[in-house]
């Protein structure tokens, strides 16, 4: 899949532990560790995040027909930062921040993007260990399949 190769090429020089690209059932997932994007307990984006998102945006801008969702994910440790109600709130605010950066800094069309918060409810690993919690704190860009092409495949030929 050309899109996956382009993404891997664009962000290939970044630490593999902090970014993971995978394809599952026709959907492309780009997982970015929270430590690359945000300070702990915050939804303010880091300078490093802008560099990473710029590389992803370059690939997405080259594919104007693709829609995608930005999901914020947290661990299960309760949040105590002022102005943040809980982990679900933090995950939504982080996803919204990423979407805004992609739109305002890199010109991605907001009609192509959805921001969603998953809180601690879709963990990759067990939250009982520090490693598991670190893996669960991430932002995921989900590149959605093009449904019009999918439906064309389902149409019966007459």
Ranges and model annotations:
Residues 1-22:
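Extracellular/lumenal/periplasmic "stalk" regions immediately C-terminal to a signal peptide or transmembrane helix
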Residues 23-27:
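Short Gly/Ser/Thr- and Asp/Glu-enriched loop/turn motifs at secondary-structure junctions
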Residues 28-33:
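Short, aliphatic-rich beta-strand segments
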Residues 37-55, 59, 63, 73-158:
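Periplasmic OmpA-like peptidoglycan-binding domain that tethers envelope proteins to the cell wall
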Residues 16-18, 65, 110:
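Short secondary-structure junction motifs
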